C-alpha cells in the first residue's frame, strides 16, 4: 500500500490468497498476476490474471500501439525514480528508498571498475530480491554486463546449490561464511588424526601466505613451493567440496564479519573482500581492492564516492550512488540527507592508509553503568566465530556488566550432543540441556579471554528457539533486530541481572 503499486505479482495460490486478503486496503492496485496458476483452473476474478494472460495483454497492446513502448522509454529521464527498495528495518519501520536510473547505472560502473564483471560470470542468488545487494548482483549486473544467474531452490539448500553451481562471483552475508567455516571445522574434528594434522599444517601455511596475497606481493620462493604443494594436496579439493573452486571475485557484506573468519578463508585460498554500504547508497560505498586488503576494515571508497566522518564519528557519504530521498517521508529524508551528504547511521574510523573501519551502528553503541562505551557487534562477531553459536545479542546499556542471548547452531550442537549420547527430542530440549549450556559457557569464556574486562560477557541465556524473519527477529539478510529481541525476551534478560 505504501508504495502505491498498481500491479501485484505473486507466485501461486498461497500468495494469491494473501493478496486477496489485503487488496481492499490497496486503492492503487489494478491487477494481480499469478506466475503458477496450478489449482486455480476454475478460479475467476476480474482483477486476477495468469502470467500468460498478462503477456497476451501486452502482445495485443503492442499490435495496436506499436510505438507505445519506445515512446514511454523516450520519456524516461536519468533522474526519474527507477526502483523503490525498502530498508531492512533494523532500527525502525522500513522506509522506501528512491533510487534513480542515474544512481543505478553510476553505481554499476563504479563497482565494475573494482570487481570486473564478465559476460560469462555465474552468479548464485539466494537473498530476497527486495534486498539491494541481491537486486544489484542478480538483476542489474547481468542486465548491464551479462552472465548467468542461478537461483537456489530454497533457503535450506544454499550450501548444496553452492556446490552444484560453483559460481564465479559470490556475494555472501556473514552467516554464509560462518556456516561454511563451521562445517569444515567440525568435519575436520571427525576425520582420522593423519588427515586432521595435514589440514591444520596446510591452514598454517595458508595463514603465512595470506598477508602477502592481501598486498598482492609474490610469495617468497620457499613459501611459494610449500603453499603450492599444500594447495594441490589439500586446499584445492577443499575448495571444490565447498563449491568455491571457480570463484573469481568473492565479497562479504550486509553485516559485519569477524576478521578471524575472513582470515581463515584467505588461508584456504578464497580471497574474500569485505564490502560496505547501504540501501540509501545504491548498495556499495567502500570495498577492499585487490592487492590492498586490510582485515577488520571495509576497504576504501568506490571510485567517485567521497566518505568523511562527522565529529561524533558517523560515516557521511557523497557520490552518484546516494539516493534522492525516502518515498513519502520528507522528515526522514531531511534527517538522512544534509548538504548533499548521506548520514549513514554507522560509526567508523579511518586507519593511517585511508581504510575505513566500521565500529557499529550509531544507535547500537551503548554505555555501561561504569561509563564504558561498548560496540556490541564486535563482541557478537567473536562469539559467532564459535561453530556452536549461530547468533548472539550482547546487552548492557546502563547496566553494570554485559550479558548475552545466545542462539545455538542446531546442526553442529546436535552432532556434538549425539556424539556424547545426550538425550533430547526437540530443538528446545537440546538448547536447554545442562551439558549444552556447559559447552556454550566454555565458548563464551574463550571469547572473554580475548577482550577487555568491560567487554566480557558475564552471564548468558540460551534462547529456546531459532530467530526468524517471519517473527520480526531478524531481517531478510539475517541481521538481528536488536530492539525487538530485547523487548521480546525481557523475561530472559532481567534474571541475568537479578542476582547482581
Region annotations inferred by a language model:
Residues 1-57, 439-445:
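Structural core segment of the AMP-binding/adenylate-forming
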Residues 48-52, 59-86, 93, 116-122:
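Conserved pre-ATP/AMP-binding loop-to-beta segment of ANL
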Residues 150, 223-228, 240-253, 257-313, ...:
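Conserved ATP-binding loop and adjacent catalytic segment of the adenylate-forming AMP-binding
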Residues 322, 337, 355-384, 413-434, ...:
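Adenylate-forming
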Residues 391-394, 400, 444-500:
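Conserved C-terminal "lid"/linker of ANL adenylate-forming enzymes
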Amino acid at each position: 500500500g505504501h508504495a502505491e503499486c498498481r500491479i501485484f505479482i505473486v507466485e501461486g495460490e498461497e500468495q494469491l490468497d494473501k493478496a486477496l486478503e489485503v487488496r481492499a486496503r490497496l486503492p492503487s492496485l489494478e491487477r494481480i498476476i499469478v506466475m503458477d496458476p496450478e489449482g486455480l483452473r476454475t478460479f475467476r476474478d476480474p482483477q486476477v490474471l495468469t502470467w500468460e494472460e498478462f503477456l497476451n495483454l501486452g502482445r495485443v497492446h503492442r499490435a495496436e500501439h506499436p510505438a507505445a513502448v519506445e515512446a514511454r522509454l523516450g520519456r524516461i529521464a536519468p533522474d526519474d525514480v527507477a526502483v523503490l527498495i525498502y530498508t531492512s528495518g533494523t532500527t525502525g519501520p522500513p522506509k522506501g528508498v528512491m533510487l534513480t536510473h542515474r544512481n543505478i547505472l553510476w553505481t554499476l560502473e563504479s563497482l565494475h571498475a573494482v570487481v570486473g564483471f564478465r559476460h560469462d560470470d555465474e552468479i548464485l542468488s539466494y537473498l530476497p530480491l527486495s534486498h539491494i545487494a541481491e537486486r544489484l548482483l542478480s538483476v542489474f549486473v547481468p542486465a548491464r554486463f551479462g552472465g548467468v544467474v542461478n537461483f537456489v531452490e530454497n533457503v535450506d539448500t544454499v550450501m548444496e546449490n553452492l556446490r552444484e553451481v560453483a559460481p564465479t562471483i559470490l556475494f555472501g552475508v556473514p552467516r554464509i561464511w560462518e556456516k561454511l567455516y563451521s562445517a569444515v571445522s567440525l568435519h575436520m574434528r571427525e576425520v582420522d588424526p593423519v588427515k586432521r594434522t595435514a589440514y591444520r599444517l596446510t591452514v598454517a601455511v595458508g595463514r603465512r601466505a595470506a598477508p602477502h596475497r592481501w598486498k598482492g606481493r609474490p610469495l617468497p620462493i620457499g613459501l611459494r613451493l610449500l603453499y603450492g604443494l599444500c594447495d594441490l594436496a589439500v586446499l584445492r579439493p577443499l575448495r571444490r567440496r565447498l563449491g568455491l573452486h571457480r570463484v573469481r571475485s568473492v565479497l562479504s557484506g550486509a553485516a559485519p564479519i569477524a576478521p578471524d573468519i575472513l582470515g581463515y578463508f584467505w588461508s584456504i585460498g578464497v580471497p574474500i573482500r569485505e564490502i560496505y554500504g547501504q540501501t540509501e547508497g545504491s548498495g556499495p560505498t567502500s570495498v577492499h581492492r585487490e592487492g590492498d586488503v586490510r582485515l577488520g576494515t571495509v576497504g576504501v571508497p568506490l571510485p567517485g564516492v567521497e566518505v568523511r566522518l562527522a565529529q561524533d564519528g558517523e560515516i557521511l557519504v557523497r557520490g552518484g550512488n546516494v539516493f534522492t530521498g525516502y518515498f513519502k517521508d520528507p522528515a526522514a529524508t531531511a534527517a538522512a540527507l544534509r548538504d548533499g551528504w548521506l548520514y549513514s547511521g554507522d560509526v567508523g574510523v579511518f586507519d593511517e592508509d585511508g581504510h575505513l573501519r566500521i565500529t557499529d551502528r550509531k544507535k547500537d553503541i551503548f554505555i555501561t553503568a561504569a561509563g564504558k562505551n561498548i560496540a556490541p557487534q564486535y563482541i557478537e562477531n567473536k562469539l559467532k566465530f564459535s561453530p556452536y553459536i549461530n547468533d548472539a545479542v550482547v546487552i548492557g546499556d546502563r547496566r553494570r556488566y554485559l550479558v548475552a542471548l545466545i542462539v545455538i547452531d542446531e546442526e553442529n550442537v546436535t552432532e556434538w550432543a549425539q556424539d556424547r549420547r545426550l538425550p533430547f527430542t526437540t530443538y528446545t530440549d537440546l538448547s536447554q540441556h545442562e551439558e549444552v549450556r556447559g559447552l556454550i559457557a566454555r565458548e563464551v569464556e574463550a571469547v572473554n579471554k580475548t577482550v577487555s574486562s568491560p567487554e566480557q560477557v558475564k552471564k548468558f541465556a540460551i534462547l529456546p528457539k531459532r530467530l526468524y524473519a517471519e517473527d520480526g527477529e531478524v531481517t531478510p539478510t539475517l541481521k538481528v533486530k536488536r530492539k525487538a529481541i530485547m523487548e521480546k525476551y525481557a523475561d530472559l534478560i532481567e534474571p541475568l541481572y537479578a542476582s547482581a
